[in-house]
């Protein structure tokens, strides 16, 4: 009887050990894939080539995230919103996008410039050839919305 119990325990131990080994292999495979392709759906860390869907850290190459995505070393697109640029050719973001070191386009709206770039609207300039954007023009110069409205009213009363 003692021998039978001992055999059952050994068989159970062997099954658990095999199961643990399989889990470890799956975890290691996932780690390798994460390192290789990077990123996750949400709050995904970057990777060599990747990023995450939301709040994704960038990556070495072509990294970025959909929202609040950090850029990347090379061709790092920003994010849809509040996207950081990239070291080289880093596009900004759709909104409040930071530029990039080189040829960094600003953002669609309130885009910071870049080392060599500018933004579409309210864009800060750039170190070199950085054209800013100008939403309101008052007699050939940029002005605020309030000044623009006042100028329009003044022009309408004079005509």
Swiss-Prot record:
InterPro entries associated with the record: ESR_Regulator, GRP
Extent of the Sequence repeats: 38-49, 50-61, 63-74, 77-88, 91-102, 105-116, 124-135
Chain residue ranges for the region called 7 X 12 AA repeats of G-G-G-Y-N-H-G-G-G-Y-N: 38-135
Pfam families named among the record's database cross-references: GRP
Induction context: By environmental stress and abscisic acid (ABA).
Key words of the record: Repeat, Stress response
Family per similarity comment: Belongs to the GRP family.
Protein name (database record): Abscisic acid and environmental stress-inducible protein
Species per Swiss-Prot/TrEMBL record: Medicago sativa subsp. falcata (Sickle medic)
Taxonomic lineage of the native organism: Eukaryota, Viridiplantae, Streptophyta, Embryophyta, Tracheophyta
